Amino acid sequence: MALAVALGGATLPAHANDAALKELRQQIDELRSQYESRIQALERKLEQAQQQAQPAPAATAAAAPAAATAPSAVAMPPKSLDNRFNPSMSVILSGTYASLKRDPDSWELSGFQLGDDGHGVGPGERGFNLGESEISFRANIDTFAMGAVTLGLEDDHGIEVEEAFVQSTALPNGVTLKAGRFFSALGYQNEQHAHAWDFVDAPFVHQAFLNGQYKQDGAQVKWVLPTTQYVELGAELGNGKSYPGAERNSNGLGATTLFARTGGDVGDSHSWRLGVSWLRAKAEDRLWGGGHDHDHGGDEHAGEEKLFSGNSRLWVLDGVWKWAPNGNASSTSFKLQGEYFWRKESGMASVQEPDLPLEEGSYRSSQSGWYLQGIYQFMPKWRVGLRHDRLSQGTVRTAVEDLQPEEHNPKRTSIMLDWSPSEFQRWRIQVNDDRARLGIKDTQIFLQYQMSLGAHGAHSF
C-alpha cells in the first residue's frame, strides 16, 4: 500500500520542485530494497527446508571430501542412529521371611554330594533375609550388538556378577552370538533369574546337579532354523569353573553345552516347548561342601575336605505347556513345567580329615531326578502353584568309605500363592513339605516380596 501511495503521489503538479521528486524516488528505492530483502530471506528459508528434507546419503556424500583429507580419523555412524550410551536400568528388590521347623545348618540332600557354598542351595536362614536383589544395565552398543550387566546382591555372597555379556543383534540367517558371563541355556529354568521363578527356591535337581544355577564364562551360539516349525539349536564353550566343573589352571575348554529346542502353538489358546540339553564339564579338585550322610550334632567332620577330579556329564529333558483363553493371559492362565536330569560322573575322589590319613580312590556315579510344577492364575493378579521334586540316588561306586551314601531318595512337595497388585511387585507365601534328609521331615514356610524399579525386559517363553 505504501508503494501505491508513493506511485499515486508521483502525479504531482508541474510546479513541484526537484527536491520533492528526489525524495519520492528515494522512498521508492527504499521500499524496493526492503521487498527484495524479504524475498531473498524467504528464498533462503525455502532452500534450507529443501536441504533438510533430502535423504541422509546426500549429507554423507557432501561430507565425503572432508573425510578424505583425514584418513586416520575414526568414521562416525550417521547421527540418525541412536547408539549413544543410554542404558536401561532396573533394580529388583527381594526379601524373604523363613519359618523352618528343622535347623537349616543340618540341611542336606542325603545320598548326594553337593557343591561347596552353593548359590540357592538349601532353605536358607531362619527369620528375615534380604534374599537376592539385583541391579541390571542393558543397552544397544550399535546396530550390530547389545550389552548387559546384572549384579546380584546377597548377604552371604556380597556383590556378585551374575551376568556380563555382549550379544549380536544383526547377524543373518537366524544366528545369534553371545560372549562373556551368562546363565547357560541348559534346560528351561536355568536361564531365568531368581525373580522370574514361580517358587521361592530352586528345584532339587538344580540344587543337586547345578549347585543352584549354572553360569558359563565363555561363548554361546544359537541358530533358529528357517523352517515353519520353530527349531533352535545351540552350543556353548566355556572355562567350566562353575559346578559341576571347577577352577582349572588350563588354557583348554572346561565345559561344553549343546541344546536343541522346538515348540509352537496349538490353536489360539495353547503353546508348548520341548528341549533337550547336554553338559560335559571337567573338574580338577572340585570341592564337595555338603551332602554327607552323618549326624551333624557334633564336630565329627569339622575341617573335613572332600575333592573330586574327573568328568561330569549331564543330560536334561525339559518341557513347558501354556494355556490362556484366546492367548489372553490377563484374567486366567495355566502353565505346566517340568525337567528331568540324569548325571554320570567318573574320576578320582579323596577325603581328608584332620589328624587322619588321606582317603582316596576311584569314584563313579549315575544319579537322576525330576520335578513337575503347575501354576494356575485363577483371577487377575492371583496365582496358585503346586510343585513336586524327587531325586533318585541311583548307583555310586567308590573305594572311599566316607563317600558311600546311605540309601535315600530325597523328595519335596511345595504349594504357593502369590498376588501381583501391579507388574512391578509381587507378594508370595509358600509351604514346603521337605524330606531331603534321611528320616527327617521339615515343614518350611516362606513369605516373599519382589519389587521392580525401572525398565525391565520381557521374560522368555
Annotate each language-model stretch with its function.
Residues A14-G118, Y230, L453, G457-F461:
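N-terminal periplasmic/intermembrane-space "pro-region" immediately following the signal or transit peptide
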Residues M76-Y243, S250-D268, S366-S368, Q373-G394:
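Outer membrane beta-barrel
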Residues F165, H270-F461:
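Outer-membrane beta-barrel pore domains
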Residues P244-R248, E305-K306:
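Active-site rim elements
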Residues E23, E36, E43, E47, ...:
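Acidic-residue sensor for enzyme active/binding pockets
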Residues N17, R38, G124, N129-S133, ...:
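Short N-terminal amphipathic alpha-helix/helix-capping patch enriched in small hydrophobics
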Residues E47, Q54, L171, S184-G187, ...:
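Generic short alpha-helical segment signal, independent of protein family or function
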Residues M1-L12:
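Gram-negative bacterial Sec-dependent N-terminal signal peptides
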